[in-house]
Amino acid sequence: MAKDKNKYVDPATYPSLSDHEISTVRKIYSFTETYFQNPRFDASHDFQHVRRVLGNALTILEKEEEERKQKALPALNPLSVILGALLHDVEDKKYVDVTTDGQKMTLQKAVIEAGMSQSYAEHVQLLVEGVSYSSEIKNPQHVKDLIDIIPELGIVQDADRLDAIGAIGIARCFTFGGAKGARSLQDSIQHFEDKLLKLEGMMKTEAGKAMAKERSDRIREFMKWWKDEAGPTVASN
């Protein structure tokens, strides 16, 4: 069984961050923690989700950096990975009725107030906009092109999608369905087939692919247990 537990409890301790970047990380971490205290967010999309995504991202980042060194590829930007992970669900349209401009205002303001430039804030915004699963389904080529420009996006994408599968993903799926009140238990099981089990094939990094394989297998095993216990599904009239 893979051992992928993130060792960076404090993201500001990630190697190679400058003093200024460490300060920025701490400010954005605090901003995000406060932001997700709003009761509109349920347990499927809360600060604990953000922390898990951040942990996944740093685990993948470390492995990707090692691989890039071996292949003499350009270095990645740890700050972009960290901020992208922390901010990826700010003004999520599933919870907040805002325009894209409204999201940009919130994200960019937070990054600028944390000590970064307007141009870098726009860079982080572009990364965050590319994380969305629905956006990739609508225009996969755009996301592919964006990852070519911002390779850190692939890491944050994988990190977020990993939290949608495995044991955590199962819990989050049922939690979201219950919180929104529009999805039955059987509908949630169907969601595993319709979306969650497809995420493994959408991973961008080698580390993400390996982690997704194990977590997807856990969903498949759970679905076997569900069918054993629930019996045949009877369609309602």
Regions found by a protein language model. Give the residues of each.
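Membrane-interface starts of transmembrane alpha-helices
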Residues: 117-124
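Amphipathic alpha-helical segments within well-ordered protein domains
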Residues: 58, 87, 91, 107-112
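Divalent metal-dependent phosphate-bond-processing catalytic cores, especially two-metal-ion Mg2+/Mn2+ enzymes
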Residues: 2-20, 39-47, 51-74, 87, ...
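His-Asp-centered metal-binding catalytic motifs of divalent-metal-dependent phosphohydrolases/nucleases
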Residues: 74-96, 103, 125-134
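Short alpha-helical hairpin
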Residues: 17-35
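Conserved strand-to-helix beginnings and helix N-cap segments that scaffold or border functional pockets
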Residues: 96-100, 167-168
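An active-site-proximal "capping" alpha-helix that borders the catalytic cofactor pocket
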Residues: 53, 101-113
